[in-house]
């Protein structure tokens, strides 16, 4: 007798840099806890982000911009991801990097506009009228063919539907009769018919017929419990970019040209302003009718100093348009030259007139104690045991070098501990690994000392 164990098919999730961030870690009054939801320290910045989240949720923040500014490794990207976690999956969050806008196929401004539209959601509410029940009768009514001849045409179909609450007799259009034939509906089947579109769906055979012996294996379903005529509300979430793409490249077409077009490599197409204008008109009409509501989301642009002066000028116009999301910039630059200009220096590499429109949130350097806490959280996330001594030593390394470097030493040190037959990382493992690798500062120091030996 052979017994096999079934292995789980779930994919093992790779631990990314910010896997441990679960939210902003604020209490009910919006005050930041010292360490919560994977974030440590940065209380002022987290509280400011909490205010931004509240403004976004109350839809009072659209078209504004926020800048997260601070030295490298102080948690700017982590804060942006925490904002995304706080907002939940119903609010669109579109992350991008400043260098993404440079493409050989489409304009820089087009890439920006695409991401702007990705960050604006549309929640469409649709009420569907549905007739559901077990078919008790199915009678097509025929009339003489108006075109002459001996054939007859179906004028309408009488169908009886039964549920646990009652029965109804419906008179249906002849076009629905074709759908009934396609679905092979017979008396005793449970079906539902959509009133708006006329779509028919056969759910299965009623379970009162389950005792019948049939050659074909049927799926038996219980008798529907509610009324025959029901109204269901369906909510769909789409982004404006989804609507743009759907209308820019309509699928289908049976002629040879469209067939060839589908076979060829799809080139990235630019969506024209005219098309976007028409989509905006339709969206505004839906909003006025109350069918849809606009959900302004978040566009997160990391390394914003990589954008050039043309992109910044375009951002001015985009931020002031009626359909604009909340834009969060992040940069680690101090005073530097704006890309695309010869000698115009500006704080954070952003033009002063755009800086004037943004609310700036500063992130501060971590204290040694906070660094230790972050390293401890990372070790727990990666499932690594670490002794107190090793943790203190890693905290010291982080203070001298950078937080990223000390976090990166965790996995190699864990590997070394396992080779030595230890369950947890000890101080000597960290010291040994630290001697093998260089951080950025010590590497630059060696480079300065041995400059003449390197190629110019």
Curated annotation (Swiss-Prot):
Disulfide bonds: none annotated. GO terms for molecular function: ATP binding; ATP hydrolysis activity; DNA helicase activity. GO terms for cellular component: dynein axonemal particle; Ino80 complex; MLL1 complex; NuA4 histone acetyltransferase complex; R2TP complex; Swr1 complex. One of its GO terms (biological process) is chromatin remodeling. SUPFAM superfamilies: P-loop containing nucleoside triphosphate hydrolases. It comes from the Eukaryota. ATP binds at residues 70-77. It is an enzyme of class 3 (hydrolase). InterPro entries: AAA+_ATPase, P-loop_NTPase, RuvB-like, RuvB-like_C, RuvBL1/2_DNA/RNA_bd_dom, TIP49_P-loop. Has single-stranded DNA-stimulated ATPase and ATP-dependent DNA helicase (3' to 5') activity suggesting a role in nuclear processes such as recombination and transcription. Proposed core component of the chromatin remodeling INO80 complex which exhibits DNA- and nucleosome-activated ATPase activity and catalyzes ATP-dependent nucleosome sliding. Forms homohexameric rings. Can form a dodecamer with ruvbl2 made of two stacked hexameric rings. Is a component of the RNA polymerase II holoenzyme complex. Component of the chromatin-remodeling Ino80 complex. Component of some MLL1/MLL complex. This is RuvB-like 1. The lineage of its organism: Eukaryota, Metazoa, Chordata, Craniata, Vertebrata.
